[in-house]
């Protein structure tokens, strides 16, 4: 702290603390929006695959087929 009185030094220190807190909060909010945007983009790509996105494997029986039981239910639980 240079050249000021006690009051000025306290204000300068409080300003630095406030600046660090604001920068930290902005970084946190930025990371939150970044994650939210990436998640939303991935969901939209999977939901609307015909519009240039990817696809969820196994999301449609016509595309990926579906599970067919190989045993009768009674034989699964028989002792």
From Swiss-Prot:
- Protein purpose: Component of the photosynthetic apparatus. The light harvesting B740 complex binds bacteriochlorophyll c.
Q: What is the lineage of its organism?
A: Bacteria, Pseudomonadati, Chlorobiota, Chlorobiia, Chlorobiales
Keywords, A to Z, come to: Bacteriochlorophyll, Chlorophyll, Chlorosome, Chromophore, Electron transport, Magnesium, Metal-binding, Photosynthesis, Transport
What species was this sequence derived from? Chlorobaculum tepidum (strain ATCC 49652 / DSM 12025 / NBRC 103806 / TLS) (Chlorobium tepidum)
GO MF, one term, reads:
metal ion binding
Binding residues annotated for a bacteriochlorophyll c, in chain numbering: 25
* Family statement drawn from the similarity comment of this UniProt entry: Belongs to the BChl C/E-binding protein family.
- State one Pfam family annotation: Bac_chlorC
Q: What's one GO BP annotation on this UniProt entry?
A: photosynthesis
Cited InterPro entries? Bchl_c-bd (IPR001470), Bchl_C-bd_sf (IPR038387)
What name appears for this protein in its UniProt entry?
Answer: Bacteriochlorophyll c-binding protein
Key word Transport present in the record? yes
Q: What is its main location?
A: other
């Amino acid at each position: 702290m240079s050249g000021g009185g006690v009051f000025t030094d306290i204000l300068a220190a409080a300003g630095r603390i406030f600046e660090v807190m604001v920068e930290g909060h902005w970084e946190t909010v930025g990371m939150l929006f970044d994650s939210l945007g990436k998640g939303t983009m991935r969901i939209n790509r999977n939901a609307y695959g015909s519009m240039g996105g990817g696809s969820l494997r196994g999301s449609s029986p016509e595309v990926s087929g579906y599970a067919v039981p190989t045993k009768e239910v009674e034989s699964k639980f028989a002792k």
